[in-house]
């Protein structure tokens, strides 16, 4: 088995034109991942052709995403984030509960794409705003019309040092 490793430039995440377009919002909605992962793994072991096809498409999609980041193509990056969201929903019907859909409906016109990182169903909502003005509008909407007391924006930044493990 041959593994490939790609270096991905940070331009789409750090350049002033794009930096403020990446938004992370804690939805205040929770869901445990254990049951979700168990269902997906079960479908894989049962050779569910639908699930296996989705997983194969996700693999190709990850390579498309890497190529898009290497080309510094912001609009395609946002569209591919949206495609990721559609794939996640096809893999697990519990990915987008009504409370999450309500949040998305408020902001989707201002985004190129969005998704719930991780297992879905709640947690964080990552959004790629169309431009910095759209990002400001998203912040206004979700700050003025908070879906629950736990929901809030979370600052995020690309790490300059990468993943580090320390031992205490």
Q: Which residues does each predicted region cover?
A:
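C-terminal nucleotide
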Residues: 1-115, 126-168
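Short Gly/Ser/Thr- and Asp/Glu-enriched loop/turn motifs at secondary-structure junctions
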Residues: 118-123
């Amino acid at each position: 088995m041959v593994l490939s490793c790609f270096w991905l430039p940070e331009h789409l995440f750090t350049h002033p034109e794009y930096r403020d377009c990446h938004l992370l919002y804690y939805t205040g909605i929770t869901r445990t991942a254990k049951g979700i992962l168990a269902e997906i793994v079960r479908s894989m072991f049962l050779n569910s052709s639908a699930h296996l096809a989705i997983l194969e498409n996700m693999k190709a999609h990850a390579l498309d995403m890497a190529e898009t980041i290497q080309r510094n193509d912001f609009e395609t990056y946002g569209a591919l984030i949206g495609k990721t969201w559609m794939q996640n929903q096809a893999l697990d019907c519990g990915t987008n509960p009504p409370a999450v859909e309500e949040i998305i409906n408020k902001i989707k016109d201002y985004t190129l794409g969005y998704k719930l990182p991780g297992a879905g169903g709640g947690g964080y909502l990552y959004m790629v705003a169309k431009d910095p003005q759209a990002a400001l509008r998203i912040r206004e909407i979700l700050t003025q019309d908070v879906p629950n007391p736990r929901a809030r924006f979370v600052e995020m930044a690309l790490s300059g040092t990468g993943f580090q493990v320390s031992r205490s």
